[in-house]
């Protein structure tokens, strides 16, 4: 591997620090941890103190006085200071709605954690996909360049033969057509690799100078990983139990269930213990220059009787949403199982496919050599040679694609069962040089 080549592990640690989608998930998890604290607060004591101080108060008081059957209005002016202090502590003793909200808040914290883990898993898959896309495209570029060199040599040879009177314009035109098509494909591949590089650069927070900085697929024998467990039913069982999207769907369903209980609590009474203390001086117009102190301890009971049918409607609504979340969970499970089976089939049949493509490449090489000899002997035309070269070119492309398809399928298989980690990244990294 060149000293400057960037490995998948290098990009993995950079992506953890710089990928904006994953960093958003980190903050979502931090925010989600507070759900439980918010829910618990509704079951804990509530203490409040109110203080009011008015150093200057003015009052004008006018009242009539009867003097010898005459009414006289007397006016008095007062300037006084007033203050009041109130302290209240309350503790819920029975509040079914608040308790249901607390249980929901615990599940919301678990849901936020599941979302974080799922985003982390998706980060690894996106990194592998983008890395493979760059590596795969650069392999196709190398094949394309090699094919162009072959066509250019054949074109030069055919032009010399034509000048000597042994070649034909048809051969030259056929080669030029193949060459121009290959050059057009090369331009498309350059755009494709630039797009893949930009996606990868966005994840790691820095621009990749050139695609040559990505390690290439190794030239050594491509060794498939053993599937452990080796039966699909166990993979399916593990996915149903551990898949992060399925876990999140279960949490969503549990939250919807608690929403039903929260609305059910609107039918129940609430009971609170409370204690209050107040101290005041001239707190109102009728208590000027009077000081009061009072303390109260007791229970507060509230019983809902009728609220226009709101609670009943909310119960029906939350029940429907709970049923909806159950169907959404089932849909997610079905989709995951379909994808799991598809990726499992790719992994389990890749050895057959790779052997077939390797044999196809070997056969195409033999056919090309035989066709070239026959062309020299006058038994085949230049078109036959070009077709044989095209067949080899396609077989090599199919072989490379099958290798990358296997790597992606193997990674997805472990993502669906929540077993994709740095160790799996190291295994994938070993396929590149």
What function would you assign to each model-found segment?
Residues 3-52, 58, 91, 208, ...:
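Bacterial Sec-pathway N-terminal export signals of envelope proteins
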Residues 83-87, 235, 295-301:
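Hydrophobic, lipid-facing positions within transmembrane beta-strands of outer-membrane proteins
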Residues 189, 244, 402:
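Metallo-beta-lactamase
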Residues 24-39, 119, 123-142, 153, ...:
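Amphipathic alpha-helical coiled-coil segments
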Residues 23, 46-64, 75, 79, ...:
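Small/polar (Gly/Ser/Thr/Ala-rich) solvent-exposed segments
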Residues 65-71:
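Solvent-exposed loop segments that connect transmembrane elements
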Residues 10, 122-238, 343-346, 350, ...:
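Periplasmic alpha-helical coiled-coil/stalk elements that build and connect Gram-negative outer-membrane
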Residues 57, 208, 398-433:
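Acidic, low-complexity, intrinsically disordered peripheral segments
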């Amino acid at each position: 591997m060149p000293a400057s080549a960037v490995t998948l592990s290098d990009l993995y640690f950079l992506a953890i620090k710089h990928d904006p989608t994953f960093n958003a998930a980190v903050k979502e998890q931090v925010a989600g941890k507070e759900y439980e604290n918010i829910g618990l607060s509704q079951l804990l004591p509530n203490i409040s103190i109110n203080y009011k101080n008015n150093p200057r108060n003015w009052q004008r008081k006018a009242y009539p006085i009867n003097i010898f059957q005459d009414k006289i209005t007397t006016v008095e002016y007062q300037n006084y200071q007033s203050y009041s202090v109130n302290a209240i502590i309350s503790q819920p003793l029975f509040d079914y709605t608040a308790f249901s909200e607390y249980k929901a808040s615990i599940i919301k914290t678990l849901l936020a954690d599941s979302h974080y883990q799922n985003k982390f898993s998706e980060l690894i898959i996106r990194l592998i996909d983008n890395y493979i896309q760059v590596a795969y495209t650069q392999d196709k570029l190398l094949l394309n360049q090699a094919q162009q060199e072959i066509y250019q040599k054949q074109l030069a040879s055919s032009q010399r033969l034509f000048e000597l009177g042994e070649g034909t314009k048809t051969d030259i035109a056929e080669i030029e057509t193949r060459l121009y098509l290959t050059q057009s494909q090369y331009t498309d591949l350059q755009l494709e690799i630039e797009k893949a590089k930009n996606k990868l650069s966005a994840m790691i927070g820095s621009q990749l100078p050139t695609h040559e900085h990505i390690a290439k697929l190794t030239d050594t024998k491509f060794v498939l990983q053993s599937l452990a467990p080796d039966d699909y039913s166990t993979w399916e069982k593990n996915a149903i139990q551990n898949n992060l999207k399925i876990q999140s769907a279960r949490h969503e369903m549990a939250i919807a269930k608690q929403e039903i209980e929260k609305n059910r609590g609107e039918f129940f009474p609430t009971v609170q213990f409370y204690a209050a203390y107040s101290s005041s001086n001239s707190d109102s117009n009728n208590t000027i220059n009077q000081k009061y102190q009072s303390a109260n301890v007791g229970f507060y009971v509230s019983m809902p009787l009728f609220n226009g049918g709101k609670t009943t409607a909310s119960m029906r609504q939350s029940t429907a949403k709970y049923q909806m979340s159950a169907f959404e969970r089932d849909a997610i499970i079905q989709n995951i199982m379909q994808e799991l089976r598809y990726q499992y089939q790719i992994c389990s049949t890749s050895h057959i496919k790779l052997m077939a493509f390797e044999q196809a490449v070997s056969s195409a090489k033999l056919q090309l050599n035989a066709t070239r000899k026959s062309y020299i002997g006058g038994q085949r035309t230049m078109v036959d040679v070009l077709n044989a070269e095209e067949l080899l070119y396609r077989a090599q492309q199919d072989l490379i694609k099958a290798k990358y398809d296997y790597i992606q399928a193997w990674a997805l298989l472990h993502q669906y069962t929540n077993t994709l980690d740095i160790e799996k990244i190291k295994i994938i990294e070993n396929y590149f040089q």
